[in-house]
Each structure stands twice: as structure tokens, then as C-alpha cells.
Amino acid sequence: HTSKPKDDPAAAVTPTPTPQVNPITPIQSSAALAQTEDKGSTYVDQIYFLGDKSLKVLQTESMLTGKDAKKQVWVPDTGSLPASSLDTAKYKSPVTGNNVPADEICEVNKPAYLVICPSADNISMTNEEQIKSVYTTLINAVKAKSPNTKIICCSLTPIASNYQYEDITNEL
């Protein structure tokens, strides 16, 4: 099946993507967050984000609209946040332009929630123990300076150069 007209010679080499075979089902895990009602922008205004340049879309597309929206997204100068450097990364302040570690951001701003979204850069060069160590160091540093901040760690997404792995799920 192709996505181009039959008279197009390139039609035979442009396949239509296969729909997802496995439906998304709720994860049964003690770590899974329960579904909640929409809390609106007041709730979102309390969330700070540490991550790579892909998070900047939250600001450029005006998804964050509160009085502190410019202070809610923190990205390293390089635009990349490899998981292996979570414990040493410094983030460019959208307010001062200074580069500061995550715990100082939280000490000054006291966010109710901190979402950590590392990039998968160089992830193949680290192992499970290293990842656990850098996350633990970062979380402990943040908690020491902002003990009431709730921390949400985003998972790293699987990366593949083709659709061979399209059926990867949390059940694997």
C-alpha cells in the first residue's frame, strides 16, 4: 500500500506507516501516577522543568503562561542534557544568564514540582549504576535545598533509526 498515486514512479518505494499493533493500556505499577482532574494553569505555574532544548517549546509556543513562565524552563547552554551529567549540569538562567546547578535553581525559586527530562545523548556509554548514581546525587542535592519540591523523573525514550522497534512498550 502506498501513499502516492499509482502513476507516480516513486509510489512503490514510499510505504504507508503501519498502525500501532499494541493498544496503549494503563500501566499497573506502584510507580504509575493515577489519573487526576485538570488543575488548570495555577497548577502548571508551579512546575519547573530541567531538560534539553526540546523543552524550550513550552515557552516558545506559550504553553506556560503564568507570571513566572520565563523562569520555569531550565536548559544547559549546550542545549543538551545527557542523563550521565545530571549531577554536574549547569543551567542557563533565563533571568540572569548565569549558569547554575539545579539545586541552586530550586533553592531560589522553591518550585512545588520539578520535572527532570534528560536527553538520551551518549546513553549507550553509561550503565544502570551510573544512571542511578547521577539521579540520586541530583535528587538529594535538590531535596537538601528545597525539601518540599516534588520531583518527577521522565523516562528516557527508546531510540531507533527505523521502525523495527516500533512495538517497544513498558512491558518489555
Predicted regions and their residues:
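N-terminal, intrinsically disordered, polar/charged segments of Gram-positive cell-envelope systems
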Residues: T2-Q46
